[in-house]
């Protein structure tokens, strides 16, 4: 008798799908919520988790940013149900314009948080490599964690060790018809340009596939950041009532993370420019004035050095 997930018959030989099934096994729970766009990555993830006998609720978000988005979202939900998953369709509004990608991501995660406290997403090793390069262009090369936390939502990324070729190949093996987002072919989006132009060029220069090395660098950046963040968390009480200038002697990376934590604890948005100027109040103190960090009802918020501490005044 053929193996089934829902009404979908599984092929006897499916090497790409097997890679995904192996990838999800360390993360499995009885019931998993998965963000499903209908694209090959998330569709293959839903199938892999179902094949491993977990229950799945697919959450399909319609961002209302493209013509026909409602049809795409409902088709994704229908494919999930065909495989035996439950599916929820939720419509959200995202303001178009500059920064639309980030705004859509924030709105999507906010919608997930209304429906569950943990969401699985289908980022692959290829996404990890692209994220690392994009971060490097902003001066902050970093990677994605396989498990990360937002205030009201845990995010699980079980496919960071799998390739995009595996998810696309699995859809072919299973006879699934994923949606292909037209924006993924538009090099006006920086991530797409990285994918379609930069990584192929790196492959030529490198003489081989650059993705595993970039993904490894991203993972190491994540691991290093976790060490520093752990130290910051343990020492947070030290700057509960102002940031002591005695911390100027800490290693640069740790000190700047501590400063950023101090500022965020006071509700201040952190930028590299602000952090550089505030750090100089510690490491290059010449009696300079305060650093503007925002506004309050009484005027301008500043970080100033007084009585052996950095403090926020207005």
From Swiss-Prot:
CDD domains listed in its UniProt record: TilS_N
Keyword Methyltransferase: no
Enzyme class: ligase
Pfam family, one: TilS
Family annotation (InterPro entries): Rossmann-like_a/b/a_fold, TilS/TtcA_N, tRNA_Ile_lys_synt, tRNA_Ile_lys_synt_N, tRNA_Ile_lys_synt_subst-bd
Gene Ontology, cellular component aspect: cytoplasm
EC identifiers of the protein: 6.3.4.19
GO molecular function: ATP binding; tRNA(Ile)-lysidine synthase activity
Superkingdom as given in the UniProt entry: Bacteria
Primary location group: cytoplasm
Compartments, as annotated in UniProt: Cytoplasm
GO BP annotation list: tRNA modification
UniProt catalytic activity: cytidine(34) in tRNA(Ile2) + L-lysine + ATP = lysidine(34) in tRNA(Ile2) + AMP + diphosphate + H(+)
Binding-site list for ATP: 37-42
Keywords: ATP-binding, Cytoplasm, Ligase, Nucleotide-binding, tRNA processing
Keyword Flavoprotein: no
Family: Belongs to the tRNA(Ile)-lysidine synthase family.
HAMAP family linked: tRNA_Ile_lys_synt (MF_01161)
Domain note: The N-terminal region contains the highly conserved SGGXDS motif, predicted to be a P-loop motif involved in ATP binding.
Annotated function: Ligates lysine onto the cytidine present at position 34 of the AUA codon-specific tRNA(Ile) that contains the anticodon CAU, in an ATP-dependent manner. Cytidine is converted to lysidine, thus changing the amino acid specificity of the tRNA from methionine to isoleucine.
Protein name: tRNA(Ile)-lysidine synthase
Lineage of the species this protein comes from: Bacteria, Bacillati, Actinomycetota, Actinomycetes, Mycobacteriales
């Amino acid at each position: 008798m053929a193996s089934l997930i829902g009404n979908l018959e599984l092929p006897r030989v499916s090497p790409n799908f097997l890679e995904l099934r192996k990838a999800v096994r360390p993360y499995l729970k009885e019931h998993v919520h998965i963000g499903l766009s209908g694209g090959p990555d998330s569709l293959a993830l839903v199938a892999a988790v179902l094949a491993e006998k977990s229950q799945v609720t697919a959450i399909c978000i319609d961002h209302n940013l493209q013509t026909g988005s409602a049809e795409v979202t409902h088709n994704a939900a229908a494919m999930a149900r065909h495989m035996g998953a439950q599916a929820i369709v939720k419509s959200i509004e995202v303001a178009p314009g500059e920064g639309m990608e980030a705004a859509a991501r924030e709105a999507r995660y906010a919608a997930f948080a209304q429906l569950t406290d943990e969401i699985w997403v289908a980022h692959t090793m290829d996404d990890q490599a692209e994220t690392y390069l994009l971060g490097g262009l902003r001066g902050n090369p970093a990677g994605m964690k396989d498990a990360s936390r937002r205030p009201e939502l845990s995010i699980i990324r079980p496919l960071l060790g799998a390739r995009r070729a595996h998810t696309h190949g699995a859809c072919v093996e299973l006879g699934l018809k994923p949606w292909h987002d037209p924006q993924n072919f538009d090099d006006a989006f920086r991530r797409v340009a990285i994918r379609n132009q930069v990584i192929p060029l790196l492959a030529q220069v490198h003489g081989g596939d650059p993705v595993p090395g970039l993904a490894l660098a991203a993972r190491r950046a994540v691991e290093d950041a976790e060490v520093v963040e752990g130290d910051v968390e343990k020492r947070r009480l030290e700057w509960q009532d102002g940031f002591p200038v005695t911390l100027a002697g800490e290693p640069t990376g740790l000190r700047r993370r501590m400063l950023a934590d101090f500022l965020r604890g006071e509700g201040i948005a952190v930028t590299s420019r602000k952090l550089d100027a505030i750090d100089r109040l510690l490491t290059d103190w010449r009696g300079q004035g305060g650093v503007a960090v925002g506004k309050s009802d009484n005027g301008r918020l500043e970080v100033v050095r007084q009585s052996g501490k950095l403090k926020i005044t207005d």
